[in-house]
Design a protein with these regions (language model features):
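Feature for peripheral, non-core segments
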Residues: 1-109, 113-209
Length: 209
């Protein structure tokens, strides 16, 4: 019978690990394994999950490093002028080819709620970088509708911002001004609010008058 591991289950499992990491008394380490020489013609052995394999791995560790901090991450998409961005759609099954959120040069994260469109209804490129910290959606001059989500602090950027991934977190309290901005956005969110619509069949025979 076909089955999938849902994203919700994955997030729940990660949340459990992070919660355990954040709790007092829990410590996590990254192990550094032994070095092995390989000839160019060798085939890499496929790892298997067995008690013996895990035991051998633990016994051959060269060293371990204690993990100081952890974070959820998502793919990084830098805002770039001339790019078409997708409006968020709850029917997405994965990250779309056109991103629906962006990171600006100021390390602020915005979600796209509506694409800019031309007179024929075709999507246009984004040419105005979103800015500002409003808790409500706003429209830029290119027709795109954005909403500010959060800012990545210097500490989080230093620890978790890479060329391909960025920090993301749902806060329950704030310890600095940037986190306060995110708390304001979270508190202002309205569950079930309609922030956009899509015309799936426009029909024919209409005039503009």
């Amino acid at each position: 019978m076909p089955a999938i591991i849902t994203d919700t289950l994955k997030r729940d499992l990660l949340a459990e690990i992070k919660s355990d990491f954040d709790s007092a008394g829990s410590e996590y380490y990254v192990g550094l394994g032994r070095s092995e020489l390989w000839d160019d013609s060798d085939n890499v052995v496929t790892p298997v999950q067995s008690a013996r394999t895990i035991d051998l791995f633990r016994r051959s560790l060269q060293g371990v490093k204690k993990i100081q901090d952890v974070s959820h991450i998502v793919p990084r998409y830098n805002w770039s002028s001339g790019t078409i961005y997708s409006a968020y759609d709850d029917n997405f099954t994965a990250y779309p080819s056109n991103a629906y959120y962006v990171k600006t040069d100021a390390n602020q994260i915005y979600i796209c709620l509506q694409q800019g469109k031309n007179a024929t209804g075709a999507a246009v490129t984004s040419t105005i970088e979103p800015t500002g910290i409003l808790t409500t959606p706003f429209t830029t001059a290119d027709g795109y509708v954005w909403k500010f989500l959060y800012s990545i602090t210097a500490l989080k950027a230093n620890r978790f911002l890479s060329a391909n991934f960025q920090h993301v977190e749902l806060l329950d309290s704030a310890s600095n001004p940037l986190e306060t901005l995110q708390i304001n956005v979270q508190n202002a969110a309205v569950s079930g609010e309609i922030v956009g619509l899509a015309v799936t069949s426009g029909g024919t025979g209409y005039s503009s008058t």
